A protein has these predicted regions:
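Active-site-proximal inter-transmembrane loops
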Residues: 168-176, 238-264, 269-271
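Catalytic glutamate of the conserved HExxH
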Residues: 82, 221, 233, 237, ...
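Non-catalytic, topology-defining segments of multipass membrane proteins
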Residues: 1-229, 274-321
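C-terminal accessory segments of proteins
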Residues: 224-242
């Protein structure tokens, strides 16, 4: 277990029940899995035949894809992950709400649920109880493949649900964030279809509207989803581990830009409350760059990151293994 993460870090009361499981919760999880994990992937497959037989690819398709991919990706890494889960920095109330909204557009789950699941992941990283470890299904080839599939995708079908009163009491007290959490489904569905509405109104062509839904909605959600899920699966199996963390987290710096800095996963597990994942010069971290921009605008403060001496000491521990 990652000893750096403690109950005190998140003000988690010890007496609460840790997880819940019921037919109602299981039904909600299956519904979400179908709506935001199966359907977007199926609809993404329609993109190629649609452009082969119905309409050519437009520049606006690529633009709406890239724009919403960046907005939702930063919403997850800067908002859901660094701000709400790890409290790695403080932000203006309107910025907090905007980041929660952008994260909800990604279709990765309501912000409070997401934070609760991720806090439990850090508490029990790669140990029994970790919601999405790939390392708990045995070391045979079949067990490893099953673990990777579990961590990447199938864990979301149905799983023990972390008690939000236990793990995220701080977020439940935030009325604005609780409001975004409550309207998650409406926000995520709007993220699928509003791009098509905008593209259709701008061009006044139904083909542009369909392309907007496919590229800005389903394809964007599917691509972003797989990059996030790959952190859970592949980066708890493969890559570099310069820091000793007590789990199986790894780095994959060559895809740090595509993951908005999340690919520095071993760095993150070594310093979970750091707003900066790319800890050294040249280690690309768009999420950190976004925090820096917010800070320069006076919209973020109390930035948490390890100093150079601590980083170097932890790196030396890693080299001495």
């Amino acid at each position: 277990m990652n000893s750096i993460v403690t109950h005190a870090e998140f003000d988690i009361p010890r007496h609460k029940k840790l997880v819940s499981k019921s037919p109602y919760i299981a039904a909600l999880q299956r519904r979400h899995f179908f709506a935001f994990d199966i359907v977007p992937n199926m609809m993404a497959l329609v993109v190629v035949p649609y452009h082969l037989y119905v309409a050519p690819v437009r520049a606006s398709d690529v633009v709406v894809f890239l724009l919403l991919w960046a907005v939702t990706g930063l919403g997850v890494t800067v908002g859901y992950h660094r701000l709400f889960t790890h409290r790695a920095f403080a932000a203006h109330d309107h910025v907090r709400t905007l980041l929660a909204f952008c994260g909800a557009l990604a279709g990765q789950g309501p912000v409070i649920s997401w934070a609760a699941i991720h806090r439990r992941h850090h508490e029990l990283s790669d140990e029994p109880g970790d919601p999405h470890s790939p390392n708990l299904h045995g070391q045979t080839l079949r067990g490893r493949l099953k673990g990777l599939m579990h961590a990447h995708y199938t864990w979301m079908i149905e799983h023990d649900y972390p008690n939000v009163a236990h793990y995220t009491a701080d977020l439940l007290k935030d009325r604005a964030i609780a409001g975004v959490n409550r309207h998650y489904y409406a926000i995520a569905l709007a993220g699928l279809f509003v791009p098509g509405l905008i593209c259709g109104l701008v061009t006044w062509q139904w083909q542009a509207a369909v392309s907007g839904i496919l590229w800005g909605g389903f394809l964007r959600m599917a691509v972003l989803g797989h990059t996030i899920w790959a952190i859970n699966s592949l980066l708890h199996r493969f890559g570099a581990s310069p820091f000793v963390t007590g789990d199986h987290s790894h780095n994959a710096g060559f895809v740090s830009l595509l993951t908005f800095g999340e690919a520095w996963h071993n760095n993150h597990h070594a310093f979970p409350t750091s707003a900066k994942f790319g800890l050294r010069r040249g280690w690309s971290d768009p999420g950190w760059w976004t925090v820096c921009v917010l800070t320069s605008l006076g919209l973020a403060s109390d930035i948490r990151q390890p100093n150079e001496s601590l980083i170097e000491r932890r790196l030396q521990e890693g080299r001495a293994r």
